Amino acid sequence: MSVYDAVAGSFDRHRALPEGAALAVREAVLGAVAAPQPRLVDIGAGSGRLGWAFVAAGDDYVGLDLSFGMLQAFKARSDIANAPALVQADARALPFAAGSFDAVLLVQVFGGLAGWRSLLDEARRVLRAGGTLMLGRTVNDPGGIDARMKRKLASLLGETPRPDNRRDAAERHLAGSASASTQLVPARWTAERSPGGFLDRHAGGAQFNRLPAALRRQALAALRDWAVGEFGRLDVRFTETQRFELRLFKFAEG
């Protein structure tokens, strides 16, 4: 069982997007594609926290993920009546013919996958001529509690907090061959965050659970102590702004 299978049941509870945000992202994605009824593949679809909006609207959408548990969670969602088209496969070896899709969507996949060049090569291969490759991510307030605790956790683990270095490299790689690129912010929202909530999310996070169990326990205990000293209580709540960014790359050739 992969770490993503292990956390599939709780993934949406900790990382769901607001309904309005998912709907706004869908509108932005469809608005960026020239085809009237575009065929879209969502690579790293996970539990469908974004894909449900496409499925509910009856779009020509395919969700792909390596984790069987995540796809089962997607299929079991209560906010979709239609059966989603889901495929379990490695993103670096997509089971689709060349030029199969008008749009390819990649949302926060680089942190959980080695070999991003192979991923992008496959994404380009299945993209039709004139198609659009899209990179999406949720961005937290850099001064908010989540960002502060993430930086502290990185320091406790002896890491340099550069969470987007693979994504940045991927963006530069795509920009070098794309005929055009642009960035959109289709959704902004406010969310309540607490130190305790951050600890709960990270205790069940797929990336964090790849670390040795003893190291995870030690890091969370130290982070908990730091948070109490920094914020007074683990249940103190803060309101912060979040946004969804979408970077679009258009390719004259597939």
Describe the residue ranges of each PLM region.
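Conserved class I S-adenosyl-L-methionine
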Residues: 1-35, 49, 53, 70-73, 132-163, ...
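Class I SAM-dependent methyltransferase SAM/SAH-binding core
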Residues: 39-93
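Conserved Class I S-adenosyl-L-methionine
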Residues: 47-49, 176-254
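A short acidic, Gly/Pro-enriched loop at the edge of an enzyme's catalytic core
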Residues: 92-103
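A short SAM/SAH-binding and catalytic strip from SAM-dependent methyltransferases
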Residues: 103-115
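A short glycine-rich, Lys/Arg-flanked "PGG" loop and its adjoining helix->strand segment in the class I
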Residues: 117-129
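Short alpha-helix
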Residues: 162-177
